């Protein structure tokens, strides 16, 4: 773990998964969630998210879809990734931008887009920080 006086610069070590969370009501992305690699987000259960820098700020979400964002490039030393064309990359980027709320995309006073840690990953990070004191 890299420790810094600036909390934003403290690393979050571990093998991780990243999920993008979408509201089933309107299809918009409302947060990204970083988990330990062996965690699974159960879309059938309420999901509590919290701000890793202000842990008292918590919200419970239901009726959502979680999409895993990271894709394997190599497995067992073999390349398993087919690189998309520039047009496919452009289309994907446009699609992801369109899935954001207008309030997040605006230039003046944009709303924050939340990237949260799972409770398990946050606990592991805190444990490592305590060991370094």
Q: Which residues does each predicted region cover?
A:
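Gly/Ser/Thr/Ala-enriched C-terminal appendages of enzymes
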Residues: 1-133
């Amino acid at each position: 773990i890299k420790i810094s006086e600036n909390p934003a610069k403290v690393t979050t070590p571990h093998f991780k998964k990243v999920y993008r969370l979408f509201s089933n009501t309107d299809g918009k992305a409302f947060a990204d969630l970083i988990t330990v690699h062996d965690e699974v987000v159960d879309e059938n259960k309420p999901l509590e998210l919290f701000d890793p820098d202000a842990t008292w700020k918590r919200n419970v979400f239901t009726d959502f879809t979680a999409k895993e964002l990271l894709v394997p490039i190599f497995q067992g030393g073999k390349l398993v990734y087919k690189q998309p064309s520039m047009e496919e990359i452009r289309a994907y980027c446009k699609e992801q931008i369109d899935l954001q709320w207008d309030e997040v995309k605006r230039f003046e006073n944009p709303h924050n887009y939340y990237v949260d840690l799972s409770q398990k990953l946050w606990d592991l990070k805190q444990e490592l920080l305590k060991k370094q004191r």
